[in-house]
Design a protein with these regions (language model features):
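Conserved NAD(P)H cofactor-binding loop of Rossmann-fold oxidoreductase domains
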Residues: 79-84
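Active-site helix of classical SDR
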Residues: 111, 147-150
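N-terminal Rossmann NAD(P)H-binding glycine-rich loop of SDR-like oxidoreductase domains
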Residues: 15, 23
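SDR active-site lid
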Residues: 164-233
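The beta1-alpha1 cofactor-binding region of Rossmann-like NAD(H)/NADP(H)-dependent oxidoreductases
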Residues: 50-61, 93
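Substrate-binding pocket helix/loop in short-chain dehydrogenase/reductase
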Residues: 87-88, 95-97
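Residue(s) in the substrate-gating loop at a strand-loop-helix junction
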Residues: 131
Length: 266
């Protein structure tokens, strides 16, 4: 019962990048943090549970383990994810499925596991990490953009399902962030000649933007502050720059929006 008066929080993908920084920020704010990832990279004051979010049984087992010890789960932050880049024509179906299995269905697995307990306790907060790429449809990053768009649509609908039970669902749209995500991305420039060099140019632009992106520690603190809110919004966009970009993508005529994206990444 150590966590009776502290928030009990799960962070997926907590071994690196945004997940790790978020877990650290939550710990520093006084939360009891459980980190789900396949790799155990110890962090003081944070409990690691070896969980592959694509393994539904492993997720369910880990959540039950937390409930047995803490009796509640206050919040979940779904950070686990990775990216693939390359032309759709040259991306295998297995690669595309792997992208969705982690980014989308991994999030679904974790949320399904915690929802019965949150519904029973009459409160909870699910935070799903999306991306500005969900609304700015980036060529040669098609499956990543699609997986994040799926997260956003799913989150809006889920909010309507669970709001009557005191459960909040929040989407956090992120832009370019300087983490190991760039190095971890599965990159392919297959077909670059057929596409007139556009694949390599687009991938290079993405990598440049990420290497000059926001500090992940700032993002971790930003997400930790959302967890503290009593009445969180359904959508937050990190930084004024990306808030403006996200808004533009949502209000501009589709033809204008796509022309801008094509000019930058096409």
């Amino acid at each position: 019962m150590a966590g009776k008066y502290k928030k009990i929080v799960i962070v997926t993908g907590g071994s690196s990048g945004i997940g790790r920084c978020t877990a650290s920020a939550l710990r520093d704010s006084g939360c009891i943090v459980y980190e789900f990832s396949r790799r155990n990279i110890p962090m003081e004051g944070i409990t690691h549970l070896s969980v592959d979010v694509t393994d539904e049984n492993a997720v369910n087992s880990a959540v039950k383990q937390i409930i047995q010890k803490e009796t509640k789960i206050d919040a979940v932050i779904n950070c686990a994810g990775f990216g693939i880049s390359g032309a759709v024509e040259f991306t295998s179906t297995d690669q595309a499925k792997a992208q969705f299995n982690v980014n989308f269905f991994g999030t679904v697995n974790v949320n399904k596991a915690v929802l019965p307990f949150m519904r029973h306790q009459g409160n909870g907060h699910i935070i799903n990490i999306s991306s500005v790429a969900a609304v700015a449809h980036i060529p040669f990053q098609t499956f990543y953009s699609a997986s994040k768009a799926a997260i956003s649509s799913y989150s809006y609908a889920l909010e309507n399902e669970v709001k009557p039970y005191g459960i909040h669902v929040t989407i956090v749209e992120l832009g370019d962030i300087y983490t190991g995500f760039t190095q971890m991305r599965q990159k392919s420039i297959l077909g670059d000649d057929e596409y007139g060099g556009r694949i390599s140019r687009s991938v290079s632009q993405m990598e440049h933007d990420e290497q000059n992106g926001m500090n992940p520690e700032v993002i971790g603190k930003y997400i930790a502050n959302i967890v503290k809110k009593k009445k969180p919004a359904i959508v937050y966009v990190a930084s004024a720059k990306y808030k403006f970009l996200s808004l533009l993508c949502k209000i501009l005529p589709a033809a204008v929006r796509e022309k801008i994206v094509e000019k930058v990444y096409g």
